Each structure stands twice: as C-alpha cells, then as structure tokens.
C-alpha cells in the first residue's frame, strides 16, 4: 500500500475545531477511497458508505433529519458510536445522491462532532445536474496521482525519499535519483500502475492498466457531457489530446478536427472539472498577484505522465535517452514538472499554475512556469545548457525589476549561480535537479533566508 502525503493534510483538518465536512476531489482511480481507508485508522469509529450501493444510498431517503439518517446508518452497519470519541463518516460516490450533497450543510450545523469526508469518481456530473456543494459549509482537498516522493517510498527507496524531503542529497546519490526520476516519469503516478511496477519492476506489464484507465475515462464521458455532440468532442480529445501534453494549444480545429474553438474549449473544461487535465494560462505581468491572460492560448497538462507515454507511444524513448530533456523534444519533462508543481499547489491550498509570455509585439520570450513565493514571482525554466542560453529567463528578469532569484530545472546537480543578463541585471539562478521539484517552496525558503 502506498503512503500518500495528503494524509498529513487530512490529519491537520481532523484536529481543527472549526472543521467543516470535507469534499475530496480527484480523477478516477487516483486512490481517494484507499486514502480515506488509511486515514480512518486515526479514528475510534469508521463508517463507510458507498452510494453506488442501494443499501447505503437509501439511508438518505428515509428522512430529511440528519440525526435520524445517522441513526439509521449506525443501525444498518451495526455500529455503536460514542459522540465523545472520534468518529469518521466517509460518503463515497456522493454524486449518486444529490440529497446527500445538500445535507452536508446540516451535518455541519447540527452534528459538528462528526468528522465527514465525501468523495466521488464523477463529482463533475453534479455540474451537469446543476447541483453544487453548500457554499461556506464544506471545504475541499484534491488528490492527484502519486508524487516522486510517494514513488520512492512505494519502490522501497525510503532513505532516498528522506534525503529528498530534507533537501540534503549527497552528490554521490545524484545519478541514482535522476535515474529513478526518469523511471517515475515513465511509469507515472497512478496507484495501480505504480503498485504493479513496484512488485515486479517490469514496465511491460503496465500496458493493460493504462488501457483500462483510458477505457474507463472514455466510458465516463456520457455521464458528464451535456449532449451527444460533446460526447464525441471529448472522446476526440481523449484520443488525440495526449500528443499535445506540455505544449501551448489552439482550440480551433484541435487535433486535426473540424470542431470550433468554443466547442473544444468547453469540452476541455469538462475534462478539467473531472481532474483529467489542466489548462494553464500565461501571465504577461511580473508582479503579485499573478493574473492569467485567459484570452491567450493555454498549455495543456494531463493528469499523468504514465498514461501520456502509453497513449502516444513514447515509452521506448525513456530507454533510449539518458536525459529526460531529450525525451519527446522536452515535452515529457515539462509535463512531469507541471505534475509535481500541481501537487505542491494542492497541498498548500493554492489553485492556479501559470507560465509567462512577454507582452511585446514581435517577442517570442516564454518562461515555462512562474511560481508565486510569498510576495514575489519566481520564473522556472525547464532546460539544460549554459546560463547564456536562458534567453527567456533573462528577458523575464530584466522585466521584473524587483526579482532577484530564478529557477532552472535540469538533470544536473543542485547549485546556485550568480548570473548577469546581457542588459546588466544580476540575479541568483537556482539549478534544481528534477527530483527536487516537489520541494520547491522549501528550496526557495532556504535561498531567500
């Protein structure tokens, strides 16, 4: 079983006096149910409902009174609950009972002693039904595919995981960690694929898992698409969209289709609500807060590199190239960095991820990511080579008068360089190995002390 880092966030939530019912969001098969089963070990009593099962779902049909509903559940499950002890109620697949969604506010108001987590593999179907969670009465967490730290722990590399977590990797372990990070990018972070790989160390056995995941996503389309036309568009995206991962996209005629910009945009947003992808928009300013230019072309980031590699047939490239930056023209590297950064954002309850483009006619300057660190904006470029070749990064630093630190993610060792742009601006460049991306905030904290 994989130890998920979000357990720490759940533990913190459970200890808060002002705790609200928690809605755990995430794509299908990222491990939401398993995570809550692990988390439940911190409780004296654990009651688990699956609203896909009629016996569990009918509890919400007997009454509108949450105390009566809870009493019915306890009798049905043959569980005696002491309200002076810690009790967790997990409502899985809650999208199957809209009434259960509405009643979360009353559990919060009338039974605050009860810890409640709700989850579902198709929460986005509530959007289609025009049903929303009670405003101000619930809080949210998001679970993504496994991070690199979770990959290390799952593959019996706990000592290396601790080195990464503490940011004290000795140079002697650098090549080993880079090799493991490349393998993590190849396998991806979907729990079923990761557990299978951890048990036999054989990438060739994972194809049926990836195929099953893709089939499942395709089968779900009809449940949240608004009409038959959108079903076809979403299935087109799920077939051809993986080849655009880590790249700036154009909505109109996406993937060689005849679909309009509006049709593709709406379909991509449906998939974004399903946590299958993210549309990351650019910023043109270099100040806090970062405000995305949503009229510009976004980058397409899918939920998992392992599914991406399988879908577009580039798995062998990882075995042919020693550097991740050489795999699929560098797009795989940008995809996996985006995945790792997204996990950091989620665990810190931050939402949006951006990249930067220079707002100047005729300019092609673009920085892969911009990261808000406290009151500053930090540019992040995924690139190897000499410092002189980081022209877009130099352009950003020249534009951002108050910025004095930048990050280059690369396959080399950790170091910090003093760099001067051609225009004379001096700044510090953190050369960050791929395996440290998930520790970006702590790395920046140390660098800015």
Regions found by a protein language model. Give the residues of each.
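Short glycine-rich substrate-engagement loop in P-loop NTPases that contacts/grips substrate
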Residues: 53-85
């Amino acid at each position: 079983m994989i130890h998920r880092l979000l357990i720490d966030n759940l533990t913190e939530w459970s200890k808060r006096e002002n705790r609200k019912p928690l809605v755990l969001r995430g794509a299908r098969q990222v491990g939401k149910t398993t995570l809550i089963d692990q988390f439940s070990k911190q409780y004296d009593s654990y009651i688990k409902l699956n609203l896909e099962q009629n016996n569990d779902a009918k509890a919400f049909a007997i009454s509108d009174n949450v105390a009566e509903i809870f009493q019915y559940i306890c009798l049905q499950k043959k569980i005696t609950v002491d309200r002076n002890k810690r009790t967790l109620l997990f409502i899985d697949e809650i999208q199957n009972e809209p009434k259960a969604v509405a009643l979360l506010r009353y559990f919060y108001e009338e039974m605050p002693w009860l810890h409640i987590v709700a989850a579902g593999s198709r929460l986005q179907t509530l959007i289609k039904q025009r049903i929303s969670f009670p405003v101000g009465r619930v809080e949210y967490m998001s679970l993504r595919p496994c991070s690199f730290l979770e990959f290390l722990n799952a593959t019996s590399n706990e000592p290396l995981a601790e080195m990464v977590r503490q940011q004290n990797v000795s140079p002697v372990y650098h090549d080993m960690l880079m090799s493991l990070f490349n393998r993590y990018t190849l396998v991806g972070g979907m729990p079923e694929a990761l557990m299978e790989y951890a048990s036999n160390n054989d990438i060739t056995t994972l194809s049926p898992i990836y195929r099953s995941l893709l089939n499942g996503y395709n089968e779900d389309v009809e449940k949240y698409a608004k009409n038959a036309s959108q079903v076809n568009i979403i299935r087109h995206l799920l077939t051809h969209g993986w080849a655009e991962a880590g790249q700036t996209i154009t909505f109109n005629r996406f993937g060689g289709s005849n679909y309009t910009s509006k049709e593709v945009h709406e379909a991509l947003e449906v998939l974004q609500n399903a946590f299958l992808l993210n549309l990351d928009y650019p910023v043109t300013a270099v100040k806090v807060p970062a405000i995305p230019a949503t009229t510009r072309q976004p980058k397409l980031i899918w939920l998992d590199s392992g599914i991406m590699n399988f879908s577009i047939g580039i798995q062998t490239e990882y075995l042919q190239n020693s550097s991740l930056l050489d795999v699929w023209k560098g797009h795989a590297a940008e995809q996996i960095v985006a995945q790792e950064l997204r996990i950091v954002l989620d665990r810190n309850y931050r939402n949006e991820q951006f990249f930067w483009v220079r707002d100047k006619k005729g300019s092609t300057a673009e920085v892969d990511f911009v990261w808000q660190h406290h009151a500053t904006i930090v540019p992040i470029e995924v690139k190897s080579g000499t410092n002189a070749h980081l022209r877009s990064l130099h352009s950003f630093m020249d534009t951002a008068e108050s910025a004095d630190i930048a990050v280059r993610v690369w396959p080399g060792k950790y170091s910090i360089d003093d760099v001067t742009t051609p225009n004379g601006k001096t700044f510090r460049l953190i050369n960050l190995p791929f395996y440290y991306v998930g520790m970006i905030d702590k790395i920046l904290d140390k660098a800015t002390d």
